[in-house]
Amino acid sequence: MAHPESLDHMLAAWNEPDASKVRGHLERALAPDVEFIDPSVETHGIDEFEANVEKVQAAIPGAVYSRTSGVDSHHRLCRYNWQISREGEVVLQGFDVTELNDEGEVRRVLGFFGPLPDGD
């Protein structure tokens, strides 16, 4: 599977400083019934996803959201590492597992914070 364009639009939404433009990125990236689940939130639909983006942007003003790995994919699933940084300092890092629908839109995002724990 090629690197899906929808992932780039989703990332662009997190980095968009103009709130009036966030929705356009999300509509190019997300399925209408998108689910976003990470340790801090669970959202359903584009409206809730957009509200979460705005909430996180307000909580970490000036943050830069970036992928820190390539995108590994099979079937309709993608995984990649990411980080949030501000003024050159990493604020949070983690990884996402993203499911796409048949049209290549993001259907589900499962986010995890921090590195994986050590094995037993």
For the regions a language model picked out, list residue spans one by one:
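Short acidic-aromatic low-complexity motifs
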Residues: 1-32
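Hydrophobic pocket/interface hotspot
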Residues: 10, 22-26, 34, 49, ...
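A solvent-exposed, acidic/Ser-Thr-rich amphipathic alpha-helical stretch
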Residues: 23-75
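Short solvent-exposed loop/turn micro-motifs enriched in small/polar/acidic residues
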Residues: 62-64, 90-93
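Hydrophobic/aromatic beta-strand elements that line small-molecule binding cavities or substrate pockets
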Residues: 66-71, 82, 94-99
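Short glycine/serine/proline-enriched coil/turn segments at secondary-structure junctions
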Residues: 74, 87-90
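Short beta-strand segments that buttress and anchor functional surface loops
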Residues: 79-87
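Short beta-strand edge/turn micro-motifs at domain boundaries
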Residues: 93-120
